Structures are given as structure tokens and as C-alpha cells.
Amino acid sequence: AYSIEAEVVVMDDASTDLDIVKRNRSINDLEFCRVIESEENIGIAKNRNHLADVAKGDYLLFLDADVYPVSLDFLKKYIDNRVDDGVLCGGMTFRLDGPVKMSPLRYLYGMKYEVKQPQFISLNFFLPASVFQKVRFNESFSKYGHEDTQFGADLQNAGYKVLKIDNPVYHDNGDTSEQFVIKTRVAIDNLVEHRDLLLPTSRLLQLYEKLHALPIGWLMKIPFKKFRQRMEKNLLGDSPSLFIYNVYRLSYLCCKYEEYER
């Protein structure tokens, strides 16, 4: 048998659904588990920092609410591979037969880009509490999106390792395609707002900079301005195109830049 001393701390970021609040509070009835209720929505970055502040252990494992460990020895893998000078990222995968129905666009995007995990993703990572406290999440990221990208960059800039190991979770994301598209735009809003910080690590921003330098770079605004409805019809359908999704993202980014530069 494998025995460890651990606690589970859950953050409820001002849920408005009373059924969810009730279910979350039942966590307090479980041994070594507790839930913290925020009076207002403070955002992902502040949430993670607060969880780290109240946690009692020497190591921290961060998991999003919509993930589930793939392996039965999930915790053991992290403990056996722990490092004192960095963070372990276990990665993610997706399943079509999970407890929630994934939208075609969300599943397609996740399998194409997120499973490969080209950069730090915060839904499943493990690190010493001391390392976290020296870096912490940048709380200027109050909106959805890219706070994890910046945290990963801050870790590396501080000299810490970001190591990937094979210890995935199922990401049972229940967003509809429409919700995912809305989140995409919100994340791009955040990307543009923090463009000076994120330019070194964001491929989308780097691509924009290259196109913007060209005489015909302004043409990339046209797809979102002229064909937004057609593109969204494809993205919300049963057979979405990732090519159209990427054009949608880039074109929206170009339009947002135009707004910020006015």
C-alpha cells in the first residue's frame, strides 16, 4: 500500500448556481478536504495564488475542476518524479465517453493542440510550494486566458525547470461550441491587453507582428469583419474546420489590435 499525507482544498469562485454551491459545500464532510467560498469572482490567477497561500503541504498539485486522473497511481507518479527546482506538468487527454458531452470544436481543438502540450498548461501541474511562492501567478490577468502561459514563462525566467511527464488527466470540458468560441475571443482580448508580456511566448502574437509588418497585413482584418457569421456557422456545426478556427482567431486578433491602437 502507498500512504501519503495530503489535503484537498477546493476554491468556489463565487458560484451563483445554488445547486453547485450545495454540492461544493458537501466537500467539507470528507476527511482531509475543505472548500473555500469566495464572496466575489476574483479570477483564475488570484484563485490559484490564494489556494497556494492556504495550503499546508510542502508540495502543491493544481487540478482544474473538470479534470479526472487517468492513472490509479496518479499521485505516486508525481511524488516519485518530484523535483525541488521546477514544476512537473502531467498533461491531458480527452474522451468521448466521459461524463459530459464534448462539443465537436472543443474536442477537435483539444486533440490537435492541447494534448501535445507545446507550452505550460495549468490544469494539471505539481511543484514545491516554495517554488510557487517565489513566482506566483500574475494577478493582472483578471480575465480568462493566458495566465498560465505567463506563469510558465515566469518560472523559466526565474531559472526553474518546466518538465513534462506522462501523467495525464481527462479534460472533461462541457463547454458548447458557442461557449468555446466566446472564450476564444475573451482570451484574445486578454492576449492583446497583455501583449508586451506575452509576445515572447505567444505564437499568435508573433504571427500577427510578422503579418502587420507586411504591406498587405491589413487584409487579415477582413475575415472577421466580413465573414464572421459564416465562420461561426461552421465552428458551431457538427464538422468544424480548425483552419477556419485559426483564421477566425487571427482575424479577431487583428481587429482587437486596431481597437487598442486608436
Q: How should these model regions be labeled?
A:
Residues 60:
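Short aromatic/hydrophobic "clamp" motif used to bind/position activated sugar donors
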Residues 144-151:
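Acidic donor-binding loop at a coil-to-helix junction in glycosyltransferase catalytic cores
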Residues 186-189, 203-262:
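Non-catalytic, C-terminal membrane-associated alpha-helical segments of glycosyltransferases
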Residues 38-55:
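Glycine-rich, basic loop-to-helix element that forms the pyrophosphate-binding segment
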Residues 163-195:
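Active-site donor/metal-binding and catalytic loop motifs
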Residues 1-37:
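Acidic donor-binding segment of Leloir-type glycosyltransferases
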Residues 110-127, 142-144:
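A recurrent flexible, glycine/aromatic-enriched loop bordering the glycosyltransferase active site
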Residues 68-101:
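Conserved donor NDP-sugar-binding/catalytic core segment of glycosyltransferases
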